[in-house]
C-alpha cells in the first residue's frame, strides 16, 4: 500500500542525482506547508568559500539553529573528503524528536547523517510518530528508506515541477 492509498501516513522520499534540486524542492514545500501545518525537521545546505564547496551546515526548521554538519578535512568520522561534526547530530536528533509535529522535513537520509550515532533510531521514532514526512534520500540509501515505508520519487530536472505538484497535492497544498 502506498501513501497515495492511505490517509493516515505520508512518507515521501525524494531521490535523484546530485544537482537536480532535491533540497530546493523540499525548501519550497516547507515554505508552503508552514501556513497549514506545524513543521519540524532539518535541512542541509552547502557551505561555499570563494565558489568552492567546503562543507555542509544543518538547519533546524523550527528554531533556525544552524550548525556545521561537515567540513573538508582529515579525521573521523568522515564521508569522502568531509569530516562529520558529531555535535551537529544533537540538532538533527532534536529536530526529529520535536513534539506536536504534523509534517517533518528531513534533508537528507544519507551517509553523513548516518554517522550520527542515534540517527537511525531517531528516524524510526519520527516515522512511527509523525504523520507526514518529506525527505530527501541519497540514492545509495533508497533501500533503507523503502524499508522504513517511504515511497521514493526519482527527481530529475525534467520532472521537477510535476514532482513539486505531486508532493503539494499529497499535503493538500496548492501553488
From Swiss-Prot:
It catalyses: a ribonucleoside 5'-triphosphate + H2O = a ribonucleoside 5'-diphosphate + phosphate + H(+). GO terms for molecular function: ATP binding; ATP hydrolysis activity. CDD domains: RecA-like_Thep1. Gene3D superfamilies: P-loop containing nucleotide triphosphate hydrolases. It holds the Pfam family NTPase_1. SMART domains: AAA. It comes from the Archaea. InterPro entries: AAA+_ATPase, Nuc-triphosphatase_THEP1, P-loop_NTPase. Keywords: ATP-binding, Hydrolase, Nucleotide-binding. ATP binds at residues 16-23, 103-110. Its EC number is 3.6.1.15. It is an enzyme of class 3 (hydrolase). SUPFAM superfamilies: P-loop containing nucleoside triphosphate hydrolases. HAMAP family: NTPase_1. Has nucleotide phosphatase activity towards ATP, GTP, CTP, TTP and UTP. May hydrolyze nucleoside diphosphates with lower efficiency. Belongs to the THEP1 NTPase family. NCBIfam families: PRK13695.1. This is Nucleoside-triphosphatase THEP1.
